[in-house]
Amino acid sequence: MSGVVALGHASSWGAALVRISPYTFSAIGIAISIGVSVLGAAWGIYITGSSLIGAAIEAPRITSKNLISVIFCEAVAIYGVIVAIILQTKLESVPSSKMYDAESLRAGYAIFASGIIVGFANLVCGLCVGIIGSSCALSDAQNSTLFVKILVIEIFGSALGLFGVIVGIIMSAQATWPTK
């Protein structure tokens, strides 16, 4: 009976997560930060671009001024790259004897959580900016006075990505590796 309990404890998720190197969590967090941010930017560019091309057939004058929506989507990818660079500078060398100390695990988890926060905030931001950019292109093709009004809404949608970057930077401040 005690063998079953010991086996159950050894195979628990908590025990498995503690055995994974904090550097692995850090690397996954950095990859999620940049990868998911670029995915959000690409998705937003796709949504905006397809509507812009379709609406430009009817009203060619909207093409150049509605490219700002694509630039807002590209900014989302840049947010992810910037945070990935910041997170990478948080990595430090730790002696193998202190690799699984609580401080090392906390640093690895903090970088991982920061990457997840930034990545998925930028994914949502890219979708938001893409949908609003699509609406901006379609409405501008019908009524050119709506462009500036919808552009203001797009700026507020872009703030979602900035909020994610701010929270990610604050979260990454918790990543302190043990000293030698």
From Swiss-Prot:
It is found in: Endoplasmic reticulum membrane; Golgi apparatus membrane. Keywords: Endoplasmic reticulum, Golgi apparatus, Hydrogen ion transport, Ion transport, Membrane, Transmembrane, Transmembrane helix, Transport. Coiled coil: none annotated. Residues 1-26, 88-110, 171-180 are lumenal. GO terms for molecular function: proton-transporting ATPase activity, rotational mechanism. The keyword Ion transport applies. GO terms for cellular component: endoplasmic reticulum membrane; Golgi membrane; proton-transporting V-type ATPase, V0 domain. CDD domains: ATP-synt_Vo_c_ATP6F_rpt1 (cd18177), ATP-synt_Vo_c_ATP6F_rpt2 (cd18178). Proton-conducting pore forming subunit of the membrane integral V0 complex of vacuolar ATPase. V-ATPase is responsible for acidifying a variety of intracellular compartments in eukaryotic cells. V-ATPase is a heteromultimeric enzyme composed of a peripheral catalytic V1 complex (components A to H) attached to an integral membrane V0 proton pore complex (components: a, c, c'', d and e). The proteolipid components c and c'' are present as a hexameric ring that forms the proton-conducting pore. This is V-type proton ATPase subunit c''1. It comes from Arabidopsis thaliana.
